[in-house]
Amino acid sequence: MTVHSTWKEKVQLKKDQLNSKIKDEWKLNSTTITRLKNDKKNLIKNIDDLCSSSENQITHSTIMALRQALEAKELSCHEITAAFCHRAALIHQVVNCLSEIMFSEALRLADYYDSNRPAILPPLYGIPISLKDQCNVEGVDTSLGYLCRTFKPKTKNEESLIVSFLRDLGAIIFVKTTVPSSMMATDTQSNTFGYTYNSINLSFSSGGSSGGEGSLIGAHGSLLGLGTDIGGSIRIPSSYQGLFGLKPTFGRVPYLRVDNSFEGRETIPSVIGPLARDLSDLRYFMSCVINICQPWVQDVKCIPYHFDSSTSKLHDNYVVGIWYGDGVIDPPPSDIRALKTCEDLVNKTKGMKAVKWEPSSELSRELFDLANEADVADSGNEIKNEFEISGEPLLDILKPMVLENGRPPYTVNEWWDLTKRVYNAQQLMRDYYLSFPESERPDVIISPTTLMPFRPGDMLKTTLRYILLFNVLNFPSLSIPVGSVDCQIDGLMDTTSALNPEDKMIKTYWNDLIQSGEIDGFPIGLQVVSPTFNDNEVCKFASWLFSKI
């Protein structure tokens, strides 16, 4: 048997394992799958049509509403769990978003909860929660999209602390979701699981690296799930599927025993946080994990903190920074329109004002460069080695990470220099913030995120310039949906006014999407950010904003 056939056979074994965990009555025939894939902008409605009205009522609800129904005994844990398992199975067969299926285990636990109902229900009792693949769950794989890590189920001792917390809170873990191999790409693809499509518009990528989460939640296959973010991996899929996604300050949600690429990298670290359809659910979840579980007791990297789950009242003389552009890449007309809507609302509200947030383009470039340099500091050796173990071919989306003919890995001294540059850049941004008069220093900043979606294979035609810098700065950032693209209103961008070749590429790609009409109706995603540790502030302001828009 050749190496080539061996890796392909192992891929098929993994796909067969996944497929075997879907009930026969939930499996779609090829004709139906093709029909749903071709109706690219109507997946939610089409999945609704395949589910019962009671299932749709459950899956289109919120955590808070389902909790109330459970408390009133209007719904059982089994009914809720079965509804989400069924819907997740249907969605997966169209967009390919699941890496591990635990339907049988979830339904057994739901039945146990119904038979052993406590007098006071734990905060997430009976609520199905989805997990990005890298979260370790006893009895199932954590592959990170690498074929060589499949068929190696985790033990009880390897289970992630956050998973243990979810169990303590009463949640029901029912699926893990797809990631790009290594998780170091914004497009969710692997040889093992294939390609994950956007559930709002199947013409586009789901984003990454928490693409499976974004696609599943976007189509109501889960109310809330956990993702991670080292360079937009929560915010990009959230933006692309019209969701709320929180990249917290480092040390908020425990990363203990969560598998990762580049483990041990402390400069520009990855963080773990929720993606959700409903902002109140997201805030409630964070308050449960932080206030009740107190992760700092067990995870030495977590910081004591109280998370505010409900306040939306803002203090007097509230200041909002509006970031219309970094001087390197111009945001598209849809983002400008959404930013202007937010700015006008703030300025019309008594006791609030908007100011322009305009850090220098030189600082923006440095922050972007630092993130990229950190990502390839080992010249891609870790990624390359993982692929070589199984013999699977390196994916095109990862070739920018593997410097075949480039420089050698950073020396210790070069890494120290990079770390120093990160600190200096963070301080320069703090200095810019302090340069505002005290009465005009922004409490939060509203910024573009992804600018536009991309078609499968077009990952490198978009930019992360409005995303990566907040990882370098360790600013909390909340992705928020603000309307949708209107091809007639938003229109084309002027490529003759491009600031540089990259800007011209972005403008040209935008024009292609507008002229094709594919992008019409696509969610517009912005992000609310604030200086380090102000996680409460970004959520509080977003709650206020959505009570007004």
Swiss-Prot record:
Q: What catalytic reaction does the record list?
A: a monocarboxylic acid amide + H2O = a monocarboxylate + NH4(+)
Instruction: Indicate what this protein is called per its UniProt record.
Output: Probable amidase
Q: Which family is annotated?
A: Belongs to the amidase family.
What residues sit in the active site?
Answer: K132 (charge relay system), S209 (charge relay system), S233 (acyl-ester intermediate)
Q: What is its EC number?
A: 3.5.1.4
Write out the entry's keywords from A to Z: Hydrolase
Enumerate the SUPFAM superfamilies for this protein: Amidase signature (AS) enzymes (SSF75304)
Q: Which GO terms describe its biological process?
A: amide catabolic process
Q: Which PANTHER family match?
A: AMIDASE-RELATED (PTHR46072:SF11), AMIDASE-RELATED-RELATED (PTHR46072)
Keyword Transcription regulation present in the record's keywords: the answer is no
Please name the Pfam families in this protein's record.
Amidase
Q: Which GO terms describe its molecular function?
A: amidase activity
